[in-house]
């Protein structure tokens, strides 16, 4: 039988310690065709070019 790392008495320790944050209400994301349209505009229309390359998530320091 395989060994476990630590005793099972400590299972879920970190989750019980973290403070509960209520989920905020956000506007609903478009579904289906509308979502694909949003992705197209994000990727190909508002292109972020850095050093001649497309960056998906450029940081604020990148010009």
UniProtKB/Swiss-Prot annotation:
Subunit structure: Component of the small ribosomal subunit (SSU). Mature yeast ribosomes consist of a small (40S) and a large (60S) subunit. The 40S small subunit contains 1 molecule of ribosomal RNA (18S rRNA) and 33 different proteins (encoded by 57 genes). The large 60S subunit contains 3 rRNA molecules (25S, 5.8S and 5S rRNA) and 46 different proteins (encoded by 81 genes).
Additional record remark: Present with 37600 molecules/cell in log phase SD medium.
Protein's UniProt keywords contain Cytoplasm: yes
Name under which the protein is recorded: Small ribosomal subunit protein eS30A
Residues annotated as transmembrane: none
GO MF: structural constituent of ribosome
Species of the source: Saccharomyces cerevisiae (strain ATCC 204508 / S288c)
Record function comment: Component of the ribosome, a large ribonucleoprotein complex responsible for the synthesis of proteins in the cell. The small ribosomal subunit (SSU) binds messenger RNAs (mRNAs) and translates the encoded message by selecting cognate aminoacyl-transfer RNA (tRNA) molecules. The large subunit (LSU) contains the ribosomal catalytic site termed the peptidyl transferase center (PTC), which catalyzes the formation of peptide bonds, thereby polymerizing the amino acids delivered by tRNAs into a polypeptide chain.
Residues the record lists as Phosphoserine modifications: 16
Modification sites for Phosphothreonine: 48
Any Gene Ontology CC annotation: cytosol
Disulfide bonds: none
Region called Disordered, residue ranges: 1-35
Primary localization class, coarse: cytoplasm
